[in-house]
Amino acid sequence: MRITMIGAGYVGLVSGACFADFGHQVCCVDRDAEKLAMLKLGKIPIYEPGLDDLVTTNTLQGRLRFDDNLADAVSQSDVVFIAVGTPSRRGDGHADLSFVYDAAAEVGRSLKGFTVVVTKSTVPVGTGDEVERIIREQNPDADFAVVSNPEFLREGSAIEDFKRPDRIIVGTDAERAKAVMGEIYRPLSLNVAPIFHTSRRTAELTKYAGNAFLAMKITFINEIADLCERLGADVQDVARGIGMDNRIGAKFLHAGPGYGGSCFPKDTLALVKTAQDAASPVRLIEATVSINDQRKRAMARKVVEACDGSVRGKTIGILGLTFKPNTDDMRDAPSLAIIQALKDAGASIKAYDPVGMEQARKMIEGIAFVESAYAVAEGSHAIVIVTEWNAFRSLDLKRLRALMATPVMVDLRNVYRGEDVVKEGIAYSSVGRERHPVL
């Protein structure tokens, strides 16, 4: 089938490349001339394992192309996906839908023949209704259907998530649209990936509810971690113990510095605002947002505590800047608030990330970016593991100890066992577990 993907960002590029790999003809449309130039040269503007090869292969085989001419692409398409950004609106926290509505208006002016218009972007309930109204206003005689098909891609494993999904949610009551969506996802249905049909509004809310639940689960285990520190329990064992219950499950029960990234912070806030507007507040999610916002500065206080109550005049080394491993995404990364809080407390900061340095330099000022974990350790009064990159899981602890001004490790991801670190002469603090002073 012929597919137009409006937006060549994270969701649009991954989805477009995967659809092309299924054999569809895909055109990714974007307004960013610099990004399009890079993509046409085979340069991928985001870091996602496997995406470079997928884009290159399908571009060379003629199934994937990039363009800025939305009207031309839409007029030739069977399916048009809207995969543009929906950031939090400044001032009130609602999702900013201006890019979605602008795209809908352009689509409306360009439709020819029956076309399925799909909102792939994460949007509040009722957005599909407005997209339909806008298209109809622009083109009263257009033959089209608007579908909600939310994405469930995790950065760092997005291709695997797209090709082997837990489920595919299709929100529409239009039978012709259901048939078209079934056809474009047919390769996945052969792998027994269930297509779940529901109403458009239900599909829109399902995406927000899913992300909010996962954010709440992360926040829950972080609260339990704080309690573990007070009571002398081990949060990792607590998480394992409750995760063995198949009603709960082990995923998203890893205590740490709080959630970040492009989805959870934005989507939980948007759900809170949507619920407030509907006079049906979601108090659990309101609490989740508040607790997570406070979490990052609480982690900075943990670092200060590990440094004998003050970091003024001290150098703190940060290992990991991105919000999670296997991505270069710095959006709402815990490192941003932690670094700022430590700077406010008088610390000098050195930092390293295996992939995220370029993006971090755009967002963080007044710190030293260095080229390895050991360069971070050199002269530091403490090192702080903020992101659990595999490269940080097997550091030479003896070498770290020799390089540091004072031997202190604050492990915000519980990567190490305290006894292993202390054995090498490094004081060790973690999250929700016993603190280990130097022997």
Go through each PLM region and give its residues.
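Structural/interface elements that position substrates and couple domains in central-metabolism enzymes
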Residues: 1-439
